[in-house]
Amino acid sequence: MATPQRRGARIRRVFWALFWLMFWTGGLVLGTALGYLHFASEGTVSRAVVAYITGETKPENAFPGKRKLTILVVGADENRDNRKRVVDSMARTDTILVAQVDFVNQRIHALSIPRDTLVRIPRHGWGKINSAHALGGPRLLVETVSNLLGNLQIDHVVIVSYKAFEEAIDALGGVTIEVEKRMVYHDNWGDLHVDLQPGVQHLNGKQALGYVRYRHSDSDFHRIERQQKFMRAVKERLKDPSVWMRVPQVLAAGLRHTRTTMEFEQLLALALFARQLSDEQIRTETLPVRNGPGTALLVKREEATQLIRELGFWDTDTYSYAR
């Protein structure tokens, strides 16, 4: 099955950076959101905002000596029982994205990895890549992704709960989108319940989460297409001036449900860097795969190697897709 190239939405505004990362269309920067709330809580918001606006928060200061920065962006949630009690905080991941920020060449390249991709998980044998987080948390997922991409060094991790998505959409006042077909799906273990009618609808946070996560009878690629379609709808929503009155609530939702290895000052620097890029300086692709056993997907090795080189993830031509 041919894998079409996936184009994510492009960062144009500071606030859009939050959604670009958090909702999976190819981003990595929620710096403004996290940085703003962090400094506000410390009582020094004015200093942080001034530094951001004037450009004092620069990558070379936040990441000394770094030419490139590779970030693993993960969308995950808790597993729950039939009574909606959390039974496992290290759930399978629904979204896996590797984004590389190139400070020298002034660009951001990102690679999304389908969650059903079959890989070798260190010390656990073969399995779908989305199970690595459940088996060993962020550390094992980082190791698995690094091995998959030719021992690529991953510098930082951002893990976003789907609760952040749900609450942020509610804070926006919902999003209008055309639902392509009847969608019904119930998963108590993953706390996912979808019941949508076809046609143009205004979705609240829970409905929107169901729309972007719905996968029953669909392939991983259909789900990715819906996620990107939804993000275009979010972008349209953000053009409404009245929405900006809701910014504090949306940012608060992102902060409450996001974990990252980066400092807030570093996130601010990334947001500033991303804000200055044009559409042509941002590229998003999907790892080339083909149908495998059952519902698993197998990496197309030659195509994957070529694509990863094109994205500039490797500093030399000696690497190749390993396993």
Task: Please describe what each predicted stretch is.
Residues 2-323:
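Non-catalytic, solvent-exposed segments at the cell envelope interface
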